[in-house]
A protein has these predicted regions:
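Extracytoplasmic soluble-region selector
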Residues: 250, 322-412
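Core beta-strand segments of extracellular beta-sandwich domains
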Residues: 81-84, 192, 345-350
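Structural signature of tandem-repeat unit edges
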Residues: 40, 44-47, 61-78, 87-104, ...
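Extracellular/luminal ectodomains and secreted, surface-exposed scaffolds of diverse proteins
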Residues: 39-45, 49, 129-130, 366-368, ...
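Bacterial N-terminal signal peptides
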Residues: 12-22
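Sec-dependent signal peptide cleavage junction
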Residues: 20-34
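Consensus positions within tandem repeat domains that build extended binding/scaffold surfaces
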Residues: 169-170, 211-214, 235-237, 257-260
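Bacterial N-terminal signal peptides that target proteins for export
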Residues: 1-13
């Protein structure tokens, strides 16, 4: 269903298989060929070429609050592998000081995200690589989020602003009790949160985009708050979010991927005047969109929209280009003088792939604003009118990229 989840599952199976083989995990770390039982644990012996250590593969005891041992049979326990998720009694895990990062053991802690009953993770204070806060596992510097327990009872999670990366092994997938999620402003894209109980999510504008399938099948999600700054929404981001009935897309958004709002409760959608492309979208959604977004059909029959820029030259047929090819816009003249009560139309020169074209850019892809509405009025088509004596500056912006130029207007 979700490509990223499928990849993660395949990787998990490959890792589990690697535990039972003699094939090197990398060219530095080698695994033993059999599991060893020590009390309630099973483990394999691995070596980084200098020292040997234990990698736990299962726990068969009945403890609900599990303390990972520092050593087994004289070997430091440095990692945990697949197998722990089969024990449905574990509610809390305390990682010892010896649990090491993947760069040292080439073993991540993905298994923590597979334990359905896990409510809390704690870490020994003298562990050099990890720390936990409120039951959530982070890197020692708190820049990476590794695991949010599947059965953690808290309804609200405000991700620390220090977090720059969420590890891509199901850290926020299939959460049972979380309702309100606020993401860190320092993430580059949203993490995978699909199949979770989330009802509300806040996405700070500093985040570049919403990644593929990020909230897929979050069927209780009914409120999405996105602040200005988001640039893209990738394929199937909100697929199967059936409770989502409305969403306000921010200015500055540039692209919307395939099936982003498929099978949601959204019936109407307003597209901001910065979007350059909408890939395949649910036909049942009524769009309110900028006129420069033109409708096209693929060979498969699927409908998509793409920004087009029209250049008109006197005595010649209008020519249309992909708006993405516009590299610069400039004024025909940067200074205009008009009489009070009179009007004139601003004209915009345009560079396509860095080459200046003859003619002027159609105003439908431009936005016009005035610095003084009492002196100069400007229409959506670029017609200015002098209202009273004075000066004003009209700013002309290319909607799709934000490129601008200014015209100084004097009214006599």
């Amino acid at each position: 269903m979700v490509r990223k989840r499928m990849v993660s599952t395949v990787m998990s199976l490959m890792m589990a298989a690697a535990v039972l083989t003699t094939v090197p995990v990398t060219n530095n770390v080698k695994a033993a060929d059999k599991e060893i039982t020590s009390g309630d644990y099973t483990y394999v012996k691995e070596s980084n070429g200098k020292t040997s250590y234990a990698v736990l593969t299962s726990y068969k005891g009945s403890e609900t609050n599990l303390v990972i041992p520092e050593e087994l049979d004289g070997l430091q326990v440095k990692a945990i592998s697949q197998g722990f998720e089969k024990n449905l009694k574990i509610k809390s895990i305390i990682l010892s000081k010896n649990i090491a990062p993947a760069k040292e053991t080439h073993r991540d802690l993905e298994v923590l995200n597979e334990i359905e009953t896990l409510e809390e993770i704690r870490v020994a204070k003298d562990n050099l690589s990890y720390q936990a806060q409120d039951g959530v596992l982070y890197s020692k510097d708190k820049k990476q989020l590794f695991s949010y327990p599947k059965s953690k009872k808290s309804e609200t999670y405000n991700m620390p602003a220090s977090v720059k990366k969420v590890e891509e092994f199901n850290a926020l997938i299939n959460l049972k009790y979380l309702k309100n999620l606020t993401l860190s402003k320092n993430l580059s894209v949203t993490p995978s949160c699909n199949d979770s109980s989330i009802e509300s999510v806040t996405i700070p504008g500093q985040i570049g985009g919403i990644d593929e399938s990020s909230f897929e099948n979050c069927n209780k999600l009914n409120k999405v708050t996105i602040t200005k700054g988001l640039r893209f929404i990738n394929d199937y981001a909100f697929f199967e979010c059936k409770a989502l009935k409305e969403i306000k897309l921010p200015e500055g958004l540039q692209s919307i991927g395939v099936g982003v709002f498929y099978r949601t409760g959204i019936k109407q959608l307003t597209i901001p005047g910065s979007v350059v492309k909408i890939d395949v979208i649910d036909k049942s959604i009524k769009l309110s969109k900028p006129s420069y977004l033109k409708k096209f059909k693929r060979d498969s029959g699927a409908i998509y929209y793409e920004a087009r820029a029209t250049i008109k030259a006197s005595g010649k047929k209008a020519v249309t280009y992909k708006a993405s090819r516009i590299t610069k816009i400039k004024a025909k003249t940067s200074k205009v003088t008009i009489q009070k009560g009179k009007t004139t139309k601003l004209q915009t020169r345009v560079y396509i792939s860095k080459k200046l074209k003859k003619g002027y850019l159609d105003s439908e892809i431009l936005k016009f604003t005035t610095s003084n509405k009492k002196v100069v009025k400007v229409s959506s088509k670029g017609t200015i009118k002098g209202l009273k004596k004075g000066k004003a500056t009209v700013t002309v912006k290319l909607r799709t990229t934000g490129k601008t130029y200014k015209v100084n207007v004097k009214v006599k």
